[in-house]
Amino acid sequence: MEASTVYYTDFRCPVGTSLTEKLRRLCIAAGIKNIDMEGKFVAIKMHFGELGNLAYLRPNYAKVVADLCKEQGGMPFLTDCNTLYPGSRKNALEHLTCAQLNGFWPMTTGCQILIADGLRGTDEVEVPVPNGEYCKTAKIGRAIMDADIFISLSHFKGHESTGFGGAIKNIGMGCGSRAGKMEQHASGHPAVQKDLCRGCHRCAKECGSDAICYNEKNKAVIDQDKCKGCGRCIGACNFDAIYALCDNANEMLDRKMAEYAAAVCNGRPTFHISLVQDISPNCDCHGENDAPILPDIGMFASFDPVALDQACADACLNAAPLPNSQLGQNLATPGWNCHHDNFKDSNPNIEWKATLEQAEKVGMGTRAYTLKKV
């Protein structure tokens, strides 16, 4: 496959030039205005940040993208799907409240917010995975698949399971419904934390497989043989008593995530933007963010999400670790087994290259790229 073009700009701002203006110029240079958006729904997929985490992208960046879409006659909306785990984004109401508390309002973003998989994370579309090796179909939030055009706006940072979180993770994991996230993270089966179960029977009423019964203490029990892994019981429980068994090895998680991302992007115009800043060692899904492991690098954009992630990863690999960080402290530990890889030296149990390998294998894009500075 021919090398893709990735556009890049740094964070330096001479007097009179703002970061939002630099992002706008980057998107235009990368070709966002070549997409026919007239009268079309445009899903802008981003992470609104868990409450307590301050590393997420500011809403001002989202407004730049939304305004560009509206200038071209598009109807943009910001979107994400509910989380698989307890937290401030596990259902649509709390998710919207979280987004608003973190500054995401129509006034600040230039468009509305839709939680793509509905109130309880069950409003999904089963989408074929092109050339899927591990997943033949992907369970994706309905509003994302209803959009005519898909744009990812990603915070590129480290990640404790996948090495880094960039465009492919934002798309693959982020667009998965609750059942989709379960399929990627696990064998697809939930479990019950008995001390939190109230015996309300709401989960059993939601289960379409008759897989939930109750023991002598009126605590839910899931029959793993009957369970189809739809995740509806997790959304049904208001007490966080049901959770997903995250038993997939990191490399399998990476590869499934890449296939999910390919399903989201297949068959329609897409555009991808990543900001490599506040490079925390872990996911923005945490209720906190540790000190950045690397200095801020810049903003990147491309029509090819695989090339985009590779370019961002390469920039991070070539950056000098910050001493007062998880990465810096690991490298300073006597006897540390140095991997000469900023992602693996921050989180040693990851296999980040598998994501890019699988994404390229299923035809989502190419790891070969040409970098053009704007």
Which residues does each PLM region occupy?
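Extended, low-polarity segments enriched in aliphatic/aromatic residues
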Residues: E2-N53, L57-Y61, E71-D80, Y85-V374
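Terminal amphipathic helices with adjacent charged low-complexity linkers/tails
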Residues: A66-D67
